[in-house]
């Protein structure tokens, strides 16, 4: 077990809020220079505790969180071993505030033979862009009831089952229309447009993964539209993102649905001085996470590519979108056999999932005076609260605070924070005084009792209710004792 110092930032907000409110509570930061528990080497490419906010899962039985890394600090150019970080957060059950962060385990993801998967893209790892091999860029995580994991990946895009030790058990069958292919039909897991003409966009595969309440269906969501499904045959111009349903028992896909991203027109109204272009719609705006609710609805986390991160260490570009939405598949058209190529408009008779605003993260953080991170990617409901509400935990992917050139030369990104200064130093070097590596940030929100009930969470008696219930039992017991005593007296 390893404990880390963290920066605790409490908001001025309290939980004395109206029913159906969601309140930002506080944040903590895990140092960008912290190390994990892997024993395969030291340094940013081996054991730096970073990037583990690509997705987040909470297990109420063990009160632990599971964070997933992506392909590593090299952007597909470094042989990094993707992993799952198991950690604990001290969550105040009265307020929802998060405290100390404790790393409990680091699980390397390995193939069936025990060899670690690699973040290297297939061309570098296998010498062939058409051979996926052990290349893995994890982005979505599910923990099954037996302790196994389902992991979604961007390269394939793939869904893979691992046992509790991180060893591969099986790979689900990816629908053919999602696999990136060249004009001759050859798969290409590395290239982008115009080299690929069908399938997922490069680096825009399965970004989120979740499991239905009954454990039978897994839902994987692409980050953005397919490469050719948009006006002018360009997915970057479209809002239509595919959600894929998988039968967990067989590993086969059963349906595909359309989730529509927020319109850039609406987002541009929020950031009129730094607008998104037509080809930013389905490229710079996308889905980061998906979470199933007990009643069959899902929560989708959607964001733009702006905010404090390795590409903007001082958060100078205004953020347009960081929001969560509740969606419903009921009534949505199964588009598994429907092509949307060449158009951003849905065909007549095709209905997308319905979508309702749930949480404007951007607005909450601005109101709290907090710099908005670029990659808020993990979302999980945490412990229930004493008032019958529930905590909601969000986590960032800090990209290991590393940037690199196209040739693979890496540098640590140091910053003094939003509006400050930044510098790049040699990997593992020392940041200039007043600067530090970009931290992983974990945010806590509190949902009221009514909000929790509206999402399908079971009712939990509030402390006052428990007190009245216990008092009632006490009075009943007292009355019974008085009655028994009276009966004994009469009998005597």
Model-inferred region functions:
Residues 462-481:
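A short, hydrophobic C-terminal helix/tail in secreted or cell-surface proteins
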Residues 21-458:
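Sequence/structural signature of beta-propeller domains
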Residues 16-18:
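N-terminal signal peptide c-region/cleavage motif recognized by signal peptidases
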Residues 1-7:
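Bacterial N-terminal signal peptides that target proteins for export
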Residues 477-492:
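C-terminal membrane-anchoring or membrane-association module
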């Amino acid at each position: 077990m390893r404990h880390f110092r963290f920066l605790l930032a409490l908001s001025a907000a309290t939980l004395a809020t109206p029913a159906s409110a969601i309140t930002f509570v506080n944040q903590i930061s895990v140092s960008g220079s912290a190390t994990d528990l892997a024993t395969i080497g030291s340094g940013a490419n081996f054991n730096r505790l970073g990037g583990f906010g690509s997705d987040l899962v909470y297990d109420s039985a063990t009160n632990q969180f599971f964070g997933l890394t992506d392909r590593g600090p090299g952007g597909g150019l470094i042989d990094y071993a993707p992993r799952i970080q198991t950690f604990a957060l001290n969550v105040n059950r009265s307020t929802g505030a998060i405290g100390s962060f404790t790393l409990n385990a680091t699980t390397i993801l390995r193939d069936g033979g025990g060899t670690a998967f690699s973040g290297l893209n297939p061309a570098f790892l296998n010498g062939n862009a058409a051979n996926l091999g052990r290349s893995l860029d994890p982005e979505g995580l599910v923990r099954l009831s037996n302790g196994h994991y389902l992991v979604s990946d961007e390269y394939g895009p793939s869904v893979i089952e691992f046992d509790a030790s991180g060893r591969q058990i099986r790979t689900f069958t990816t629908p053919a229309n999602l696999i990136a292919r060249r004009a001759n039909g050859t798969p290409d897991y590395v290239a982008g447009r115009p080299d690929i003409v069908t399938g997922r966009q490069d680096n825009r595969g399965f970004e989120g993964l979740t499991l239905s309440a009954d454990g039978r269906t897994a839902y994987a969501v692409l980050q953005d539209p397919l490469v050719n499904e948009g006006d002018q045959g360009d997915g970057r111009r479209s809002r239509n993102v595919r959600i894929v349903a998988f039968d967990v028992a067989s590993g086969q896909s059963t349906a595909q649905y359309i989730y529509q991203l927020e319109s850039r027109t609406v987002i541009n109204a929020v950031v009129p001085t730094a607008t998104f272009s037509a080809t930013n719609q389905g490229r710079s705006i996308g889905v980061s996470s998906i979470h199933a609710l007990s009643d069959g609805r899902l929560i989708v986390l959607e964001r733009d590519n702006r905010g404090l991160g390795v590409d903007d260490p001082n958060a100078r570009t205004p953020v347009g979108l960081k929001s969560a939405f509740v969606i419903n598949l009921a009534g949505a058209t199964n588009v598994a056999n429907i092509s949307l190529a060449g158009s951003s408009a849905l065909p007549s008779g095709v209905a997308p999932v319905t979508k309702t605003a749930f949480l404007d993260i951007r607005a909450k953080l601005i109101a709290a005076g907090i710099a908005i991170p670029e990659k808020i990617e993990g979302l999980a409901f945490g412990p229930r609260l004493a008032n019958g509400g529930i905590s909601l935990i969000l986590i960032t992917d800090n990209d290991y605070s590393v940037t690199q050139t196209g040739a693979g030369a890496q540098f640590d990104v140091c910053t003094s924070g939003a509006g400050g200064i930044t510098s790049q130093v040699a990997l593992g070097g020392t940041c200039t005084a007043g600067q530090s590596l970009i931290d992983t940030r974990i945010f806590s929100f509190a949902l009221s009792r009514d909000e929790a009930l509206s999402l399908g969470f079971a009712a939990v008696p509030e402390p006052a209710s428990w007190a009245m219930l216990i008092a009632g039992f006490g009075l009943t017991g007292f009355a019974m004792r008085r009655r028994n005593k009276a009966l004994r007296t009469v009998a005597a």
